[in-house]
């Protein structure tokens, strides 16, 4: 039997083209919501999205069904187990709850705000557009990283998501 795992994507893996390359067996299930978390760009040297606990907030994302081979590919791309850890979360979509696997950035990386590269930013935004995911939380996460990193400049990050 080829059982598939439910996977909650909230960053660059919202992008349908990227997921088709990385995980050819993956099937999008639909938009879902994770309550009690917010998005944040973290990691020195070029920010990547993670989720951080925040009771008054939520993260919109995409639920995928992934095969065992897809999971292995995701583990590789997400730097599991060192950069990201895997967790199980409860997500809601169209009034139905699901338990899904999610990648959450580990310490010390999650404690280091950083702006994303333009390439990563554009990949995430295209995924939002493709799936009808609101972009405002992405902008808020970018602004939070910008405030924390204002005195520093990194060669691969950019000054404003509006340019």
Task: Give the residues covered by each predicted segment.
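Glycine-aromatic micro-motifs
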Residues: 1-163
